[in-house]
């Protein structure tokens, strides 16, 4: 019961509540800032051979043809959803909701995971077009193609986890010498199928990154075929310029895509070693990997700079586009060498 001789000052109570609210907001902001720095950590590269050997030792697997590629896919997919902060693309609460660099990095990784998972299902695991597809890969592939920003019922992470589990089941059977129905065929035509996808992905990324500076481009959509037509008319000259708000999105998507691709190419070097050696293409592949590794260098500015081509400030997008374009040229040469060499 309040003592009437000492009435409570309403303004004092109000100030006390405001003080508590102020400290709560300060704590909330500081916590989110700390979490943002934690979530924004660079995901480490890993040695595909060591990871494959470690998994083989842990689970008693035999390192057979295709083992390293499959393990590398599993490792990259695991890092996608279990890195510091987990999978952020579908988060609706702070601080993840205010961060777009990591979700774009995740999307870049995801595209490469999807492409490789589909090629393993349709090409690497099948001897010819009339052969049966693997039952576990039939589950894994569509799981990885589930929409990347679904929050609940079901969550995106749960679908990708099911894809990882199905791919792991395929790996278990692949490494078992008594399981003849799980196969991985390291053939030239299979590798060419995947390289065709890779060169399209890298070409698209290079175009988006190069558009950070406004340019006039000639429309080459129908070049090389005098009888070619297209559904919708486009002018012969185009002005292309990436929105300022999309500059860092494209950059981090490319960084994520190349992160995954570096590891996949290193795994391909192991599993397709005989094919590459026969075509004298190992050095070409290693040079492509070296070009892509340059895309993972540390960024020493707090934001992605977008200076003009020969201006005072750097243009991170053009630098990234340069590395990717050189790697893509190498991919095209490698594919042609495998097809015709």
Predicted feature locations:
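Hydrophobic membrane-insertion alpha-helices, especially the h-region
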Residues: 22-36
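N-terminal Sec/ER secretory leader and immediately downstream segment
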Residues: 50-159
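N-terminal Lys/Arg-rich, disordered targeting/topogenic segments
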Residues: 1-16
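A cross-kingdom marker for long, charged
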Residues: 48-53, 57, 249-252, 258-341
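Extended amphipathic alpha-helical interaction segments
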Residues: 160-289
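A cross-kingdom feature marking solvent-exposed beta-strand/loop segments within repeated
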Residues: 91-101, 147-154, 238-248, 301-319
